[in-house]
Curated annotation (Swiss-Prot):
Top-level taxon of origin: Bacteria
Species whose genome carries this gene: Chlorobium phaeobacteroides (strain DSM 266 / SMG 266 / 2430)
Annotated NCBIfam families: thiE
EC number: 2.5.1.3
Protein name from the UniProt record: Thiamine-phosphate synthase
Length: 206
């Protein structure tokens, strides 16, 4: 089940030495969803991290999502999977995971958002909204106005991502985002738990 809006999804940072420790700090700070994302880790390492993070998510009553790897999500019964545009199609992932799992899809345009919904996604990640250093981005930021344009055309939740921080996050919620996804704003701070708590408290006060 997708958390009640507005919610925070913390995505693990590949520059972080321990995704499990980061997940724990984010959960202690009140994050409602954790997404394990690590493109270069081995399947064995990802699976172990996934097991550890899922256990923590269960304790904290949070949702656990695996990025890209439907096989790992299936093997360890994760709450869901998040797919990129070049990954398995949502409909195919649904056949493998079943109807009760969460399937998210990364999008960066209205067309991609509409296609993701038609294909059976439960939510879309939409961005990048603001300038970000978490990934190498060649395209210009979409801006919060793009969120408003998309949410008027889809019926599934939109999770805003890309350059979102404590200073601009409420702009995305006001534009219609159901949730926000963060990487650097949590992982690259001296106190990830405190940073998460400050953000979740702002969201609760919305």
């Amino acid at each position: 089940m997708i958390p009640a809006k507005p919610f925070l999804c913390v995505i693990t940072d590949e520059q972080c030495s321990s995704p499990v420790d980061l997940a724990l700090m984010a959960l202690e700070g009140g994050a409602e969803m954790i997404q394990l994302r690590h493109k270069s880790a081995s399947g064995k390492q990802l699976f172990q991290w996934a097991l550890d993070i899922q256990r923590l998510c269960r304790i904290h009553h949070a949702q656990f999502i695996v990025n890209d790897r439907v096989d790992i999500a299936l093997a360890m019964n994760a709450d869901g999977v998040h797919l990129g545009q070049q990954d398995l199609q949502p409909g195919e992932a649904r056949k493998l995971l079943g109807t009760d799992k969460i399937i998210g899809v990364s999008t960066s345009s209205l067309t991609e958002a509409l296609n993701a919904e038609r294909a059976g996604a439960d939510y879309i990640g939409f961005g990048h909204i603001f300038q970000t250093g978490s990934k190498n981005k060649l395209s210009a930021p979409l801006g919060s106005a793009a969120i408003s344009a998309v949410v008027q055309r889809i019926s599934i939740p939109l999770v805003a991502i890309g350059g979102i921080n404590k200073m601009n996050m409420m702009e995305t919620i006001a534009a219609g985002a159901s949730g926000i996804a963060m990487i650097a704003a949590i992982s690259r701070t001296a106190d990830p738990e405190g940073a998460t708590r400050a953000i979740t408290e702002l969201l609760k006060g919305h």
